[in-house]
Every structure is written in C-alpha cells, then in structure tokens.
C-alpha cells in the first residue's frame, strides 16, 4: 500500500471539493451562511483525501471512500459563499501541486454517480467570486405586462402605462 504525503492529499481534496461546488451552480442559492459556518479547506481535505490517487492519474476509478466524501460535500456545499470558498481552495491546491489533473477532478462527480453535475474544466485563473452570484430571473417585456405597445401620440398609451391590462379568457362552454 502506497502512502500519500499530507500536502498532496490536501491538494486533491481541495480540488475535488471545488469541483463539486459547481454542481449546485445552476440552482438558486439560499442566503449566505452565518460567518464561520462555511466549509473550511481542512474539512474538505479530510472528506476527499481518498480521491487523491484518482485525480493524480494513479487509479482508473475513484475509490468508494472518494465517492462517499464527494457526495457528502456535494450535499453540503449549497450557498454561493461555500462555492466561492471551495473554488479558492481548489485554485490554491492546483497552483501548489502540479500533479493534480483538473480534467480528472471534473470527472469525479460523473464516476461517483452525482446527478446534475455540470462541472466546467477547473482553471487556476477563473474568478471564483462569480460562483457566489445568483442568476436573475428574466423580466417580461413591457408589452406582455401592460398590453400592446402604443406610441406616445395614441391617447390610450398613457392609460395603458398607468393601468395594466388584465385579460381573462371567457369560460369554456358547458357540455350538456
């Protein structure tokens, strides 16, 4: 059995955790946690240490321990602040340890059966702070909110802007 140095194990865990943080990027994030409640790099490292041989390319599949830690972190990394923190941990590890393959880190969720994982390639130059931004819902065009758009010379134009139109469809005919 080969032993892994603590610094290498820490790097792996950090990288995998940041990758898992991407899995919840598409969903709307809840409010940021209270200060001090987000995952620490140490917590992430301990959970994902078994993934190190896989992301270094020394094993063809992640171990059961790796998948267990990855699934747990995927479930716990929900807020934008947690995603930003995990990303920054991964970037630090990737800058420190050159033997970690970012492509393999991105494959951990797929190999471990983590559904809806949409991990982009992990890059040491990405702006992690963008992971904390919640996407906005698109606004309806004014024409759909206030009825047809008319020009300023139309007398109904001002009335439409002041009073939104609500159209109710007629009731369906009753069957005899």
Curated annotation (Swiss-Prot):
Q: Which PROSITE patterns match?
A: PLANT_LTP (PS00597)
What is the annotated signal peptide range for this record?
1-37
Q: What is this protein called?
A: Probable non-specific lipid-transfer protein 1
A Gene Ontology molecular function term of the record: lipid binding
Keywords of the record? Allergen, Disulfide bond, Lipid-binding, Signal, Transport
Query: What does the function comment of this entry state?
Result: Plant non-specific lipid-transfer proteins transfer phospholipids as well as galactolipids across membranes. May play a role in wax or cutin deposition in the cell walls of expanding epidermal cells and certain secretory tissues.
Q: Which GO terms describe its biological process?
A: lipid transport
Q: Where is the composition biased (Basic and acidic residues)?
A: 155-165
Taxonomically, the superkingdom here is: Eukaryota
Any matching Pfam family = Tryp_alpha_amyl
């Amino acid at each position: 059995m080969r032993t892994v140095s603590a610094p290498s194990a820490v790097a792996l865990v950090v990288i995998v955790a940041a990758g898992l943080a991407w899995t919840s990027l598409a969903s709307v994030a809840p409010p940021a946690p209270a200060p001090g409640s987000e995952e620490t790099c140490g917590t992430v490292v301990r959970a994902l240490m078994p993934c190190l041989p896989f992301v270094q390319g020394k094993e063809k599949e992640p171990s059961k321990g790796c998948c267990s830690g990855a699934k747990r972190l995927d479930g716990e990394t929900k807020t934008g602040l947690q995603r930003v923190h995990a990303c920054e941990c991964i970037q630090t590890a990737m800058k420190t340890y050159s033997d970690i393959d970012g492509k393999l880190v991105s494959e951990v969720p797929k190999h471990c059966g983590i559904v809806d994982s949409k991990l982009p390639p992990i890059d040491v130059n990405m702006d992690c702070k963008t992971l904390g931004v919640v996407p906005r819902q698109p606004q309806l065009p004014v024409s759909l909110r206030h009825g047809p758009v008319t020009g300023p010379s139309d007398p109904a134009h001002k009335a439409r802007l002041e009073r939104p139109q609500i159209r109710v469809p007629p009731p369906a005919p009753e069957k005899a």
